[in-house]
Amino acid sequence: MIKRKQMWDNVLTVIMTLLCLLWVYPIALIFINSLKKEGTFTTSTVFALPTKETFVGLENYTYGIFKMNFLSSLGYSLLITLTSVVLILLCCSMTGWYLTRVNNKLSKFMNLLIVFSMVVPFQMVMFTLSKTADTLKLNTPWNICIIYLGFGAGLAVFMFTGFMKSVPIEIEEAAMIDGCNPIQIFFKIVFPILKPTMISTAILETMWVWNDYLLPTLVLDIKKYRTIPMAIQYFRGGYGRVELAPMMACIIIAIIPIIILYMTCQKYIIEGVVAGAVKG
Protein backbone atom coordinates (compact mmCIF):
# COMPACT_ATOMS: atom_id res chain seq x y z
CA MET A 1 0.00 0.00 0.00
CA ILE A 2 2.80 2.40 0.92
CA LYS A 3 4.76 1.52 -2.22
CA ARG A 4 1.69 2.12 -4.37
CA LYS A 5 1.15 5.52 -2.75
CA GLN A 6 4.80 6.44 -3.33
CA MET A 7 4.48 5.37 -6.96
CA TRP A 8 1.44 7.59 -7.50
CA ASP A 9 3.20 10.47 -5.75
CA ASN A 10 6.14 10.10 -8.13
CA VAL A 11 3.83 9.94 -11.15
CA LEU A 12 1.98 13.04 -9.96
CA THR A 13 5.28 14.86 -9.43
CA VAL A 14 6.39 14.05 -12.98
CA ILE A 15 3.05 15.20 -14.42
CA MET A 16 3.08 18.47 -12.48
CA THR A 17 6.71 19.10 -13.50
CA LEU A 18 5.83 18.61 -17.16
CA LEU A 19 2.84 20.93 -16.84
CA CYS A 20 5.01 23.54 -15.13
CA LEU A 21 7.57 23.36 -17.94
CA LEU A 22 4.78 23.58 -20.51
CA TRP A 23 3.45 26.80 -18.95
CA VAL A 24 6.88 28.36 -18.39
CA TYR A 25 8.18 27.54 -21.86
CA PRO A 26 6.32 30.32 -23.77
CA ILE A 27 7.55 32.96 -21.31
CA ALA A 28 11.12 31.67 -21.57
CA LEU A 29 10.86 31.67 -25.37
CA ILE A 30 9.64 35.28 -25.41
CA PHE A 31 12.44 36.35 -23.05
CA ILE A 32 15.14 34.67 -25.16
CA ASN A 33 13.89 36.27 -28.37
CA SER A 34 13.59 39.68 -26.70
CA LEU A 35 17.40 39.67 -26.47
CA LYS A 36 17.86 39.13 -30.21
CA LYS A 37 18.28 41.65 -33.00
CA GLU A 38 15.10 42.65 -34.82
CA GLY A 39 14.70 40.90 -38.16
CA THR A 40 16.65 37.77 -37.23
CA PHE A 41 13.60 35.61 -36.53
CA THR A 42 13.07 32.57 -38.73
CA THR A 43 11.40 29.25 -38.14
CA SER A 44 14.81 27.71 -37.46
CA THR A 45 16.22 30.41 -35.16
CA VAL A 46 13.21 31.39 -33.07
CA PHE A 47 13.90 28.47 -30.70
CA ALA A 48 17.67 29.04 -30.58
CA LEU A 49 19.66 30.98 -28.00
CA PRO A 50 21.11 34.37 -29.03
CA THR A 51 24.48 34.31 -30.76
CA LYS A 52 27.19 36.98 -31.03
CA GLU A 53 25.58 38.20 -34.24
CA THR A 54 22.01 38.34 -32.91
CA PHE A 55 22.48 39.28 -29.23
CA VAL A 56 21.64 42.94 -28.50
CA GLY A 57 21.25 42.88 -24.71
CA LEU A 58 18.69 45.34 -23.39
CA GLU A 59 18.48 47.38 -26.58
CA ASN A 60 14.99 46.09 -27.40
CA TYR A 61 13.84 46.95 -23.88
CA THR A 62 15.02 50.55 -24.04
CA TYR A 63 13.61 51.02 -27.54
CA GLY A 64 10.30 49.44 -26.56
CA ILE A 65 9.95 51.55 -23.43
CA PHE A 66 10.58 54.70 -25.43
CA LYS A 67 8.25 53.84 -28.31
CA MET A 68 5.29 52.66 -26.23
CA ASN A 69 5.61 55.65 -23.87
CA PHE A 70 6.01 53.20 -21.03
CA LEU A 71 5.70 55.58 -18.09
CA SER A 72 2.37 56.95 -19.33
CA SER A 73 1.00 53.46 -20.03
CA LEU A 74 2.27 52.23 -16.66
CA GLY A 75 0.53 55.12 -14.92
CA TYR A 76 -2.81 54.41 -16.56
CA SER A 77 -2.52 50.68 -15.90
CA LEU A 78 -1.73 51.28 -12.23
CA LEU A 79 -4.54 53.82 -11.87
CA ILE A 80 -7.15 51.57 -13.44
CA THR A 81 -5.98 48.41 -11.69
CA LEU A 82 -5.67 49.84 -8.18
CA THR A 83 -8.92 51.83 -8.34
CA SER A 84 -10.88 48.90 -9.78
CA VAL A 85 -9.56 46.41 -7.24
CA VAL A 86 -10.27 48.73 -4.29
CA LEU A 87 -13.82 49.31 -5.53
CA ILE A 88 -14.38 45.59 -6.06
CA LEU A 89 -13.07 44.65 -2.61
CA LEU A 90 -15.01 47.32 -0.75
CA CYS A 91 -18.35 46.96 -2.54
CA CYS A 92 -18.30 43.18 -2.93
CA SER A 93 -17.26 42.44 0.65
CA MET A 94 -20.22 44.50 1.86
CA THR A 95 -22.51 42.75 -0.61
CA GLY A 96 -21.29 39.31 0.43
CA TRP A 97 -21.84 40.19 4.08
CA TYR A 98 -25.37 41.45 3.37
CA LEU A 99 -26.36 38.40 1.31
CA THR A 100 -25.11 36.09 4.06
CA ARG A 101 -26.75 37.85 6.98
CA VAL A 102 -30.07 38.87 5.40
CA ASN A 103 -32.19 35.88 4.47
CA ASN A 104 -35.12 37.02 2.34
CA LYS A 105 -36.37 36.72 -1.23
CA LEU A 106 -34.50 39.83 -2.35
CA SER A 107 -31.13 38.57 -1.13
CA LYS A 108 -31.74 35.17 -2.73
CA PHE A 109 -32.67 36.83 -6.02
CA MET A 110 -29.56 39.03 -5.89
CA ASN A 111 -27.44 35.97 -5.21
CA LEU A 112 -28.87 34.26 -8.30
CA LEU A 113 -28.15 37.34 -10.40
CA ILE A 114 -24.55 37.42 -9.20
CA VAL A 115 -24.03 33.75 -10.03
CA PHE A 116 -25.66 34.32 -13.43
CA SER A 117 -23.27 37.20 -14.13
CA MET A 118 -20.37 34.74 -13.82
CA VAL A 119 -21.89 32.57 -16.55
CA VAL A 120 -22.57 35.27 -19.15
CA PRO A 121 -19.44 35.84 -21.29
CA PHE A 122 -18.18 39.36 -21.85
CA GLN A 123 -18.29 38.89 -25.64
CA MET A 124 -22.11 38.77 -25.54
CA VAL A 125 -22.38 42.34 -24.29
CA MET A 126 -19.16 43.99 -25.46
CA PHE A 127 -20.59 45.83 -28.48
CA THR A 128 -23.61 47.13 -26.57
CA LEU A 129 -21.33 48.06 -23.69
CA SER A 130 -18.96 49.91 -26.01
CA LYS A 131 -21.81 51.93 -27.51
CA THR A 132 -23.31 52.71 -24.10
CA ALA A 133 -19.94 53.72 -22.64
CA ASP A 134 -19.34 56.05 -25.58
CA THR A 135 -22.79 57.63 -25.21
CA LEU A 136 -22.36 58.14 -21.46
CA LYS A 137 -18.78 59.44 -21.87
CA LEU A 138 -17.28 56.61 -19.83
CA ASN A 139 -14.16 56.53 -21.99
CA THR A 140 -11.78 57.70 -19.24
CA PRO A 141 -9.59 55.72 -16.80
CA TRP A 142 -11.75 56.71 -13.82
CA ASN A 143 -15.04 55.68 -15.42
CA ILE A 144 -13.82 52.35 -16.76
CA CYS A 145 -13.25 51.30 -13.15
CA ILE A 146 -17.03 51.28 -12.68
CA ILE A 147 -17.34 48.82 -15.57
CA TYR A 148 -14.63 46.63 -14.06
CA LEU A 149 -16.57 46.68 -10.80
CA GLY A 150 -19.61 45.29 -12.60
CA PHE A 151 -17.75 42.49 -14.36
CA GLY A 152 -15.56 41.59 -11.39
CA ALA A 153 -18.35 41.56 -8.81
CA GLY A 154 -19.57 38.05 -9.61
CA LEU A 155 -16.43 36.17 -8.58
CA ALA A 156 -15.67 38.50 -5.67
CA VAL A 157 -19.14 38.30 -4.11
CA PHE A 158 -19.17 34.53 -4.61
CA MET A 159 -15.90 34.19 -2.68
CA PHE A 160 -16.90 36.58 0.10
CA THR A 161 -20.29 34.92 0.51
CA GLY A 162 -18.73 31.48 0.77
CA PHE A 163 -16.33 32.66 3.46
CA MET A 164 -18.91 34.64 5.45
CA LYS A 165 -21.12 31.56 5.87
CA SER A 166 -18.48 30.15 8.21
CA VAL A 167 -18.28 33.25 10.42
CA PRO A 168 -20.50 32.94 13.55
CA ILE A 169 -23.14 35.65 13.68
CA GLU A 170 -22.79 35.75 17.47
CA ILE A 171 -19.66 37.89 17.07
CA GLU A 172 -21.68 40.58 15.33
CA GLU A 173 -24.55 40.27 17.80
CA ALA A 174 -22.13 40.87 20.67
CA ALA A 175 -20.82 43.99 18.95
CA MET A 176 -24.38 45.19 18.38
CA ILE A 177 -25.13 44.77 22.09
CA ASP A 178 -22.07 46.91 22.82
CA GLY A 179 -23.62 49.70 20.78
CA CYS A 180 -22.00 49.29 17.35
CA ASN A 181 -24.01 50.27 14.31
CA PRO A 182 -23.90 48.16 11.08
CA ILE A 183 -21.09 50.24 9.56
CA GLN A 184 -18.94 49.88 12.69
CA ILE A 185 -19.69 46.15 12.84
CA PHE A 186 -18.56 45.67 9.26
CA PHE A 187 -15.33 47.67 9.40
CA LYS A 188 -14.29 46.76 12.97
CA ILE A 189 -15.47 43.14 13.16
CA VAL A 190 -16.21 41.65 9.74
CA PHE A 191 -13.60 43.39 7.60
CA PRO A 192 -10.56 42.07 9.53
CA ILE A 193 -12.02 38.55 9.49
CA LEU A 194 -12.25 38.67 5.70
CA LYS A 195 -8.48 39.19 5.30
CA PRO A 196 -7.64 35.77 3.70
CA THR A 197 -10.41 36.03 1.12
CA MET A 198 -9.71 39.74 0.67
CA ILE A 199 -6.08 39.08 -0.29
CA SER A 200 -6.83 36.19 -2.64
CA THR A 201 -9.63 38.12 -4.34
CA ALA A 202 -7.40 41.18 -4.70
CA ILE A 203 -4.68 39.13 -6.39
CA LEU A 204 -7.07 37.42 -8.81
CA GLU A 205 -8.78 40.69 -9.74
CA THR A 206 -5.43 42.47 -10.10
CA MET A 207 -4.15 39.88 -12.56
CA TRP A 208 -7.38 40.14 -14.55
CA VAL A 209 -7.52 43.95 -14.78
CA TRP A 210 -3.78 44.40 -15.35
CA ASN A 211 -3.68 41.95 -18.27
CA ASP A 212 -7.00 42.94 -19.83
CA TYR A 213 -6.79 44.20 -23.39
CA LEU A 214 -10.31 43.94 -24.82
CA LEU A 215 -12.31 46.14 -22.44
CA PRO A 216 -9.90 49.14 -22.43
CA THR A 217 -9.66 48.94 -26.23
CA LEU A 218 -13.44 49.05 -26.59
CA VAL A 219 -14.11 51.73 -23.98
CA LEU A 220 -11.12 54.05 -23.56
CA ASP A 221 -10.21 56.91 -25.87
CA ILE A 222 -7.13 55.26 -27.41
CA LYS A 223 -5.72 58.60 -28.55
CA LYS A 224 -5.42 59.81 -24.95
CA TYR A 225 -5.31 56.74 -22.72
CA ARG A 226 -3.36 53.55 -23.34
CA THR A 227 -2.78 50.80 -20.83
CA ILE A 228 0.27 48.56 -21.17
CA PRO A 229 -1.55 45.80 -23.14
CA MET A 230 -2.92 48.46 -25.50
CA ALA A 231 0.49 50.08 -25.97
CA ILE A 232 2.10 46.75 -26.84
CA GLN A 233 -0.36 46.37 -29.70
CA TYR A 234 1.10 49.46 -31.39
CA PHE A 235 4.23 47.54 -32.33
CA ARG A 236 2.11 46.17 -35.16
CA GLY A 237 2.69 48.49 -38.10
CA GLY A 238 1.00 48.81 -41.44
CA TYR A 239 0.91 46.11 -44.12
CA GLY A 240 1.36 43.34 -41.57
CA ARG A 241 4.73 44.57 -40.31
CA VAL A 242 5.41 43.69 -36.67
CA GLU A 243 8.40 44.73 -34.55
CA LEU A 244 8.67 41.39 -32.81
CA ALA A 245 11.79 41.92 -30.70
CA PRO A 246 10.66 45.16 -28.98
CA MET A 247 7.15 43.73 -28.61
CA MET A 248 8.50 40.66 -26.82
CA ALA A 249 10.65 42.88 -24.60
CA CYS A 250 7.61 44.91 -23.56
CA ILE A 251 5.58 41.75 -22.97
CA ILE A 252 8.24 40.63 -20.48
CA ILE A 253 8.12 44.05 -18.80
CA ALA A 254 4.32 43.83 -18.57
CA ILE A 255 4.24 40.40 -16.94
CA ILE A 256 7.04 40.96 -14.43
CA PRO A 257 4.81 42.77 -11.85
CA ILE A 258 2.17 40.03 -12.07
CA ILE A 259 4.75 37.25 -11.69
CA ILE A 260 6.25 38.96 -8.63
CA LEU A 261 2.79 39.54 -7.14
CA TYR A 262 1.74 35.95 -7.68
CA MET A 263 4.97 34.40 -6.39
CA THR A 264 4.93 36.48 -3.20
CA CYS A 265 1.22 36.00 -2.50
CA GLN A 266 0.41 32.57 -3.95
CA LYS A 267 -0.19 31.04 -0.50
CA TYR A 268 -2.91 33.63 0.15
CA ILE A 269 -4.61 32.73 -3.14
CA ILE A 270 -4.77 29.06 -2.18
CA GLU A 271 -5.86 29.79 1.39
CA GLY A 272 -8.58 32.21 0.32
CA VAL A 273 -10.02 30.04 -2.45
CA VAL A 274 -9.97 26.89 -0.32
CA ALA A 275 -11.50 28.71 2.66
CA GLY A 276 -14.33 30.07 0.53
CA ALA A 277 -14.96 26.71 -1.14
CA VAL A 278 -14.82 24.53 1.98
CA LYS A 279 -16.60 26.85 4.38
CA GLY A 280 -19.19 27.87 1.80
Where are these regions (language model features)?
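A structural signal for multi-pass alpha-helical bundles of membrane permease subunits
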Residues: 2-280
